[in-house]
Amino acid sequence: MSLVEKTSIIKDFTLFEKMSEHEQVVFCNDPATGLRAIIAIHDTTLGPALGGCRMQPYNSVEEALEDALRLSKGMTYKCAASDVDFGGGKAVIIGDPQKDKSPELFRAFGQFVDSLGGRFYTGTDMGTNMEDFIHAMKETNCIVGVPEAYGGGGDSSIPTAMGVLYGIKATNKMLFGKDDLGGVTYAIQGLGKVGYKVAEGLLEEGAHLFVTDINEQTLEAIQEKAKTTSGSVTVVASDEIYSQEADVFVPCAFGGVVNDETMKQFKVKAIAGSANNQLLTEDHGRHLADKGILYAPDYIVNSGGLIQVADELYEVNKERVLAKTKHIYDAILEVYQQAELDQITTMEAANRMCEQRMAARGRRNSFFTSSVKPKWDIRN
């Protein structure tokens, strides 16, 4: 056996080691459009895989694969925690979203998604938007987060923000014995589509906010909003948000915000927000517990949007979405109580609850093969 052959076998073995927890990984290549993408299906015990598609100029295929594998596994737990009948998946497109997009590229991507026969449903994520997926929808009906004009649920930031507020209410219940949002001080990092709605909801209940955002107009808007409520807003610098004398830190921007540096600065009693992957490592969940800071697992708190897009695949029913989103309150309380009872971190408690649900379903159905059929189909 030649050195080249040995090297190839080692690389193949390493690849299978990396995806050992996953059911399926699809490498998509279309030279005509320049499409290079990876679709990772982690687990379909609960139903077809569901997860967004992001587009980034990854430095290597290996980096893109790592992202797809990590994010798809996270979606499995998020779906299980949200009590929706879907498993975890994720797609990544290798390319610069500012330069490399084209209608043809997303139609090619749609063809690859459709080839999976309903095992994977996807929609927008970092670097992609609904305009991109209107093109993909010409090749597949396995697209979620569809605009209302196409029969979808519309803006998913609304139920996402609502879920965050329910998560905060549950956190306040655990901290103070009552779930009122008003009369509590919050430090909100990020006033994007979700963060701004969360801030509005808290202000309307009479909360006191420290806020930071890179957009000056957004900061001015939330200060104007505060004038119409019994709440108040104080704008702080981005690097000062972690050290505010607040009750609850509400991260609504980016991940990894609970790390060695911020741990030294936190003066809050709890953390509950919409940002994904807030803990830089699992160890930081333990560090928070040791410091007496209550942590609301992000993938439960921010699951309102997922609940809506999962609901789309059957028939949009906003009342049903609202009712399911309200259960985030109960889920977070259950996590807190279980963590306290078992003397484990809240993240460990949340993961354990999800694994128990998957194990129970796995005794009846361990592999999803048939397709859910959404009502829209604009394929040519």
Curated annotation (Swiss-Prot):
InterPro entries in UniProt: Aminoacid_DH-like_N_sf, Glu/Leu/Phe/Val/Trp_DH, Glu/Leu/Phe/Val/Trp_DH_C, Glu/Leu/Phe/Val/Trp_DH_dimer, Glu/Leu/Phe/Val_DH_AS, Glu/Phe/Leu/Val/Trp_DH_bac/arc, NAD(P)-bd_dom_sf
Top class in the EC scheme: oxidoreductase
Catalytic activity, EC: 1.4.1.20
Binding site for NAD(+): 54, 125, 156, 160, 190-196, 213-214, 253-254, 274-276
Amino-acid positions noted as binding L-phenylalanine in the UniProt annotation, renumbered to this chain: 78, 276
Use in biotech settings: Phenylalanine dehydrogenase (PheDH) is a key enzyme in medical diagnostic for determining the amount of phenylalanine to detect phenylketonuria (PKU) disease. The mutant V144L has a higher specificity for phenylalanine substrate and may provide a suitable candidate to increase the specificity of PKU detection in clinic.
Name under which the protein is recorded: Phenylalanine dehydrogenase
Catalytic activity: L-phenylalanine + NAD(+) + H2O = 3-phenylpyruvate + NH4(+) + NADH + H(+)
Family: Belongs to the Glu/Leu/Phe/Val dehydrogenases family.
Keyword NAD: yes
GO biological process: L-phenylalanine biosynthetic process
Alphabetical UniProt keywords: NAD, Nucleotide-binding, Oxidoreductase
Effect of residue 144 to L: 2-fold increase in affinity for L-phenylalanine
Annotated SUPFAM superfamilies: Aminoacid dehydrogenase-like, N-terminal domain, NAD(P)-binding Rossmann-fold domains
Substitution effect: residue 144 to D: 3-fold decrease in catalytic efficiency with L-phenylalanine, and 7-fold decrease in catalytic efficiency with L-tyrosine
Protein's job: Catalyzes the reversible NAD(+)-dependent oxidative deamination of L-phenylalanine to phenylpyruvate. Is also able to act on L-tyrosine, but with 100-fold lower efficiency.
Keyword set includes Lipoprotein: no
Pathway the protein takes part in: Amino-acid biosynthesis; L-phenylalanine biosynthesis; L-phenylalanine from phenylpyruvate (PDH route): step 1/1
Active site (UniProt): 90 (proton donor/acceptor)
GO molecular function, one term: nucleotide binding
